[in-house]
């Protein structure tokens, strides 16, 4: 594809794309450059003044341009590793920016209340207390933003085959990871404060999810193989073996979500001792569907819903136990990164989708639940976070070295 044709696809970044092609800069280098701009934006966002936010806005715009240019350059390559590398860098960029937005409140250089020229008018509105009071409330919003950032690409993977994922409506209109959400969020921070920035991020993220889901109900859409995207661990696979795929995945998952959602809404802090494990036990019902082929029209919902339940449980346990909020942020981010890495490798035939080393969604929930019930969360939480990020780094560097088609799901090959 010529530079002119590539640039015509995305006119705002056309000059950057042409320059990158002329200088033979690959998409991976553009993605790594975007991470540098993300770190710059995060650092300046944490400092808090209007001038600092202005610098962060410039960095966020540069981040948007480099991510978008890298994505356009990546259209020339059909290699799954390139696609995952672009997605991973974009996800990490969002994590850095969200952490920087919340870190300023922890460092007391940024107010948790609405600020800026528009923020004064928002005091006394729902935005002023959105997410909860004080520093913990802001970090809660950051964690929710991470959940949305991880779920948007997962929904795209579950709905579309590789050729159609990049052109899904949600990414065309509202931007994929690392795209338009970040500069818009920084503008909101500059005008109305950190909470307003997260509100904008969440609104755009939810809009992208809704648009992508609406795209799935168009005539001619057919389900794709999503069993390997669930992120099951050994325990889930073992439980699913007993029913051998005869139980549809949505029914037991719905029961688990109902119990988990109800208890989370009531507050895990109010559950004494071993009752903290009740949401985990309820979600284990979803394991009965781990061997099912997931060929139903609604079965694509199963992986995102399982992962959303895991994220909510990990976050709520951390906040209920008053763990250090950045640690809760890091653990949820590690779990989200893990799920996406496994899903991309499963789609490429480089992994079965069974998360043996990462414990799986159910293993992580069990470990955190037991730690919360026994009072050991202060040790387990950081240990699990460090382990997952080490595993993510290891698998990102060596997990893509296998041969395509080398891994199968146990339900397929026994």
Language-model features, listed with the residues they occupy:
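Functional transmembrane alpha-helices
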Residues: 27, 60, 90-93
């Amino acid at each position: 594809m010529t530079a002119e044709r590539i640039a015509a696809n995305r006119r705002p970044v056309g000059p950057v794309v042409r320059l990158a092609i002329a200088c033979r800069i690959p998409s991976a280098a553009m993605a790594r450059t975007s991470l540098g701009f993300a770190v710059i934006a995060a650092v300046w966002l944490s400092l808090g003044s209007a001038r600092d936010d202005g610098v962060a806005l410039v960095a966020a715009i540069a981040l948007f341009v480099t991510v978008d240019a890298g994505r356009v350059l990546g259209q020339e390559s059909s290699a799954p590793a390139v696609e995952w590398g672009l997605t991973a860098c974009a996800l990490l960029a969002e994590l850095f920016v969200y952490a920087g937005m919340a870190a300023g409140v922890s460092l007391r250089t940024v107010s948790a209340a609405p600020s800026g020229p528009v923020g004064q008018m928002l005091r006394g509105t729902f935005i002023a207390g959105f997410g909860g009071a004080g520093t913990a409330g802001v970090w809660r919003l950051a964690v929710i933003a991470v959940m949305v950032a991880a779920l948007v690409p997962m929904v795209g993977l579950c709905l579309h085959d590789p050729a159609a994922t990049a052109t899904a409506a949600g990414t065309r209109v509202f931007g994929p990871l690392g795209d338009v959400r970040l500069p818009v969020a920084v503008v909101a921070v500059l005008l109305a404060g950190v909470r307003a920035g997260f509100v904008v991020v969440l609104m755009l993220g939810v809009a992208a999810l809704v648009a992508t889901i609406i795209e799935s109900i168009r005539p001619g859409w057919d389900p794709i193989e999503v069993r390997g995207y669930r992120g099951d661990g050994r325990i889930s696979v073992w439980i699913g073996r007993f029913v051998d795929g005869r139980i549809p995945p949505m029914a037991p998952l719905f029961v688990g979500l109902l119990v988990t959602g109800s208890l989370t809404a009531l507050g895990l802090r109010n559950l004494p001792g071993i009752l903290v494990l009740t949401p985990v036990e309820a979600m284990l019902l979803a394991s009965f569907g781990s061997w099912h082929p997931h060929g139903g029209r609604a079965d694509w919902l199963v992986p995102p819903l399982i992962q959303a339940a895991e994220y909510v449980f990990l976050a709520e346990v951390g906040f209920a136990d008053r763990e250090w909020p950045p640690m809760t942020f890091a653990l949820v981010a590690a779990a989200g990164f893990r799920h996406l890495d496994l899903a991309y490798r499963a789609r490429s035939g480089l992994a079965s989708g069974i998360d043996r080393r990462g414990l799986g969604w159910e293993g992580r929930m069990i470990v955190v639940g037991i730690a919360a019930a026994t009072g050991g969360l202060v040790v387990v939480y950081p240990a699990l976070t460090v382990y997952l990020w080490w595993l993510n780094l290891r698998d990102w560097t060596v997990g893509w070295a296998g041969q395509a088609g080398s891994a199968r799901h146990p339900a397929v090959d026994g």
